Amino acid sequence: MSVVRIGPYTLPNRLILAPMAGVTDRPFRQLCRRLGAGMVVSEMVTSDVRLWNSRKSRLRLIHDGEDEPRSVQIAGGDPAMLAEAAQRNVELGAQIIDINMGCPAKKVCNKAAGSALLRDEALVAEILDAVVRAVDVPVTLKIRTGWDRDNRNGVTVAKLAEQAGIQALAVHGRTRADLYTGEAEYETIAAIKQAVSIPVFANGDIDSPEKARKVIEQTGVDALLIGRAAQGRPWIFREIDHYLRTGEHLPAAPLPEVQSILLEHLAELHLFYGEEMGVRIARKHVGWYLATLPGAREFRAQFNRLQDTDAQCASVRQFFAERQNNGTGVAA
């Protein structure tokens, strides 16, 4: 199995937690790393450092004690601001800077950031050059295959990235116009891999060990970014890693382990964010963890009304105790 290198860093495997706003916070990053991710990437941080004083932004800038390499994603459309944001994040502990040109969200694209940048290749080149020159750590880039299906310029952008000194390129197999609808396509990613010599990572709909192997075989990529499939299933990294190494499946996670992982995650969320914010953020994660289990919808309705950390943890323990007593088995 090929070794993945980003600048001076060698990853322990080919699986990376994709950056997701509102999801890949410090508690989730650390959990995914413990459960098999070779690298994790922070939530997107705005390049406008004037906005970093909000509590939400300050929490996104905390990386103390995290495993190396610490990769931080920045987003924006102004080369000078992105360069400054990169420098500031390195001062705060970032060891890799990732530039977001892949987010399709309207509130990002309307600010000429994220995947909106793919429409302006000259600006793309200017941004990449500015950020690479600004820092002495590896800079990576995340893109989509293009703006829409008639304008798949991923190969062109990949070549610009390589020329600018980008150390690795992640490609989501949809266009900006696709958002998250339909199925990801990997032909463009395969073409990008053939067109450049820097490491290329595939992203999009990689939700099982078999799909992971199929995408690697189809594209020849160096690594995979896993995003939405890890929500409520952070152990997917060890499952895929084991399958890629051995060709065999690990047993499904038993309910007692799922309970233990979820309670650990809740405790870290409550500690990191404080009670009020932690309780609120925990709700979506609990929904993801329990989505495939019987009675999850009814449980979520009452869980989302709980207002304190102790009640949340007690409620989760009761949910799992009832299912283990009923012999409901394992998680998906």
Curated annotation (Swiss-Prot):
GO terms for molecular function: flavin adenine dinucleotide binding; FMN binding; tRNA binding; tRNA dihydrouridine synthase activity. It is an enzyme of class 1 (oxidoreductase). PROSITE patterns: UPF0034. FMN binds at P19, M20, A21, Q73, K142, N203, G204, D205, G227, R228. CDD domains: DUS_like_FMN. The keyword RNA-binding applies. Keywords: Flavoprotein, FMN, NADP, Oxidoreductase, RNA-binding, tRNA processing, tRNA-binding. It catalyses: a 5,6-dihydrouridine in tRNA + NAD(+) = a uridine in tRNA + NADH + H(+); a 5,6-dihydrouridine in tRNA + NADP(+) = a uridine in tRNA + NADPH + H(+). Its EC number is 1.3.1.-. The keyword Flavoprotein applies. It comes from the Bacteria. The active site is at C103. Its cofactor is FMN. Catalyzes the synthesis of 5,6-dihydrouridine (D), a modified base found in the D-loop of most tRNAs, via the reduction of the C5-C6 double bond in target uridines. Belongs to the Dus family. DusB subfamily. This is tRNA-dihydrouridine synthase B. It comes from Pseudomonas aeruginosa (strain ATCC 15692 / DSM 22644 / CIP 104116 / JCM 14847 / LMG 12228 / 1C / PRS 101 / PAO1). The lineage of its organism: Bacteria, Pseudomonadati, Pseudomonadota, Gammaproteobacteria, Pseudomonadales. The gene is dusB.
